[in-house]
From Swiss-Prot:
Key word Lipid biosynthesis present: no
Subcellular location: Virion membrane
Superkingdom of this protein's organism: Viruses
Transmembrane intervals: 10-29
Keyword terms, alphabetized: Capsid inner membrane protein, Membrane, Transmembrane, Transmembrane helix, Virion
Naturally occurring in which organism (per UniProt): Pseudoalteromonas phage PM2 (Bacteriophage PM2)
Membrane topology listed for this record: Single-pass membrane protein
Protein name per UniProt: Protein P4
Gene: IV
Length: 40
C-alpha cells in the first residue's frame, strides 16, 4: 500500500479528518448549548 506520493495523500487524509472532527464537534457543542443541562 506504499506509494511514492504518500505524503500528499497523508496530508489530505489529515485535512479531511480534522474537518470532519471539527464539524462533528461544532454540531455537538451547538446542540449541547441549545438544551442547557436537561439531564443533570
Amino acid at each position: 500500500m506504499q506509494k511514492p506520493s504518500g505524503k500528499g495523500l497523508k496530508y489530505f487524509a489529515y485535512g479531511v479528518a480534522i474537518s470532519a472532527a471539527g464539524a462533528i464537534l461544532a454540531e455537538y457543542v451547538r446542540d449541547w448549548m441549545r438544551k442547557p443541562k436537561a439531564k443533570s
